[in-house]
């Protein structure tokens, strides 16, 4: 009898647990459905409201009491506007100055060469910027002088170069601005003399735009070309064939000048051993030793000195090799 009651009690407990679990499951399902229904039935945003663009926000009040809109941006940008005006005026004055100089050159006005070089360097900085061109050969004296005038100005600002250019023109021609092309009266006549030379006119055509002779082979003897190229076998053949070792080109340069300028030490040795005149001067009065110093070829200079090159010979500018050479070249102090 007691065993029956225990079985009945166990069955009742199990039934209650089962009923509790079922009820819990049902309540969970119902709650989940209610949540879904709540989400689905939530009121959407009105399409008309969503599609209507928001009115633009009113501009903030200006700090000057509401008068900001009447300034047309002239308040904060006034400095940059003035800079633009100043830059334009400087450009025009520089253009007028360079055009005036071009016209002066065309009319044959004489200007010191040093001033020409100064104008050239400033013009190149103003129109092209810092010098990046390779240094010309020492054989090209004018080209070398122009390159130095440009190169020594370094990274000078364009505006500064323009202003200095104008200052030099003012010093050379105090009254040039009286007929300046900044007034745009006779500009067409002035610019026509220079328009084919550059965007703002040349400095002095005789210096700035002179085409330098680059050693045209048609103007050189075969031995000059061989010395220039460092072709030692060809040099030996020319000498063996009886070619004059001191043969001059149109500029008075000997094969030794060419070999030194191009830095061909072996060619220099062959020529000096063939009794080349180490003191021969070109049309500018420069010897092969001048070339060695100007081109900073110390080993060749020392070789020439050993072959009794004269360090006291002056070129047309009155410069001796000893005056031009670096102080570190001690062998120069022992020469002659």
Curated annotation (Swiss-Prot):
Keyword tags: ANK repeat, Endoplasmic reticulum, Glycoprotein, Lipid-binding, Membrane, Repeat, Transmembrane, Transmembrane helix
Function: Binds medium- and long-chain acyl-CoA esters with high affinity. Can interact in vitro with palmitoyl-CoA, linoleoyl-CoA and linolenoyl-CoA. Binds phosphatidic acid (PA) and phosphatidylcholine (PC) in vitro. May play a role in the biosynthesis of phospholipids.
Mode of membrane association: Single-pass membrane protein
PANTHER family: ACYL-COA-BINDING DOMAIN-CONTAINING PROTEIN 6
Expressed in which tissues: Highly expressed in leaves. Expressed at low levels in roots and seeds.
Compartments (UniProt record): Endoplasmic reticulum membrane
Induction statement: Induced by salt and drought stresses. Down-regulated by cold stress, wounding and infection with the rice blast fungus Magnaporthe oryzae.
InterPro entries: Acyl-CoA-binding_protein, Acyl-CoA-binding_sf, Ankyrin_rpt, Ankyrin_rpt-contain_sf, FERM/acyl-CoA-bd_prot_sf
Entry keyword Glycoprotein: yes
Transmembrane segments: 12-32
Residues involved in an acyl-CoA binding: 120-124, 142, 146, 165
Region (Disordered): 40-88, 179-202
Annotated source species: Oryza sativa subsp. japonica (Rice)
SMART domains: ANK
Glycosylation, residue list: 175, 216
PROSITE patterns: ACB_2, ANK_REP_REGION, ANK_REPEAT
Keyword Transmembrane: yes
Domain of life: Eukaryota
Ranges for domain ACB: 90-178
The protein's name in its UniProt record: Acyl-CoA-binding domain-containing protein 4
Low complexity composition bias: residue spans: 42-54
Biased composition range(s): Acidic residues: 78-88
Residue stretches of each ANK repeat: 251-280, 284-313
Species lineage: Eukaryota, Viridiplantae, Streptophyta, Embryophyta, Tracheophyta
Any single GO CC term annotated in Swiss-Prot or TrEMBL for this entry: endoplasmic reticulum membrane
Family classification: Belongs to the ACBP family.
């Amino acid at each position: 009898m007691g065993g029956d009651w225990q079985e009945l009690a166990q069955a009742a407990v199990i039934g209650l647990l089962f009923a509790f679990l079922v009820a819990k499951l049902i309540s969970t399902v119902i709650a989940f459905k209610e949540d879904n229904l709540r989400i689905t039935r939530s009121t959407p945003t009105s399409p008309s409201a969503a599609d209507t663009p928001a009115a633009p926000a009113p501009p903030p009040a200006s700090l000057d009491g509401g008068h900001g809109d009447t300034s047309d941006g002239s308040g904060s940008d006034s400095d940059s506007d003035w800079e633009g005006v100043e830059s334009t005026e400087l450009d025009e004055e520089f253009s007028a100055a360079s055009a005036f100089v071009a016209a002066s050159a065309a009319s044959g006005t004489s200007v010191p060469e040093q001033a020409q070089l100064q104008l050239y360097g400033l013009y190149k900085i103003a129109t092209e910027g810092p010098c990046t061109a390779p240094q010309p050969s020492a054989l090209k004296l004018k080209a070398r002088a122009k390159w130095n005038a440009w190169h020594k100005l370094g990274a000078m600002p364009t505006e500064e170069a323009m202003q200095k250019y104008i200052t030099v023109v003012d010093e050379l021609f105090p009254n040039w601005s009286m007929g300046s092309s900044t007034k745009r009266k006779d500009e067409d006549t002035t610019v026509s003399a220079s328009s084919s030379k550059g965007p703002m006119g040349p400095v002095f055509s005789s210096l700035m735009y002179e085409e330098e002779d680059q050693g045209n082979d048609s103007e050189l003897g075969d031995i000059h070309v061989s010395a220039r190229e460092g072709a030692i076998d060809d040099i030996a053949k020319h000498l063996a064939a009886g070619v004059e070792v001191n043969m001059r080109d149109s500029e008075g340069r000997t094969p030794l000048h060419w070999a030194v300028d191009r830095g061909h030490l072996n060619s220099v040795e062959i020529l000096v051993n063939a009794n080349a005149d180490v003191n021969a001067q070109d049309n500018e009065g420069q010897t092969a030793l001048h070339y060695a110093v100007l081109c900073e070829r110390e080993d060749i200079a020392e070789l020439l000195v050993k072959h009794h090159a004269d360090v006291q010979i002056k070129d047309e500018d009155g410069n001796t090799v000893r005056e031009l050479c670096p102080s570190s070249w001690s062998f120069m102090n022992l020469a002659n």
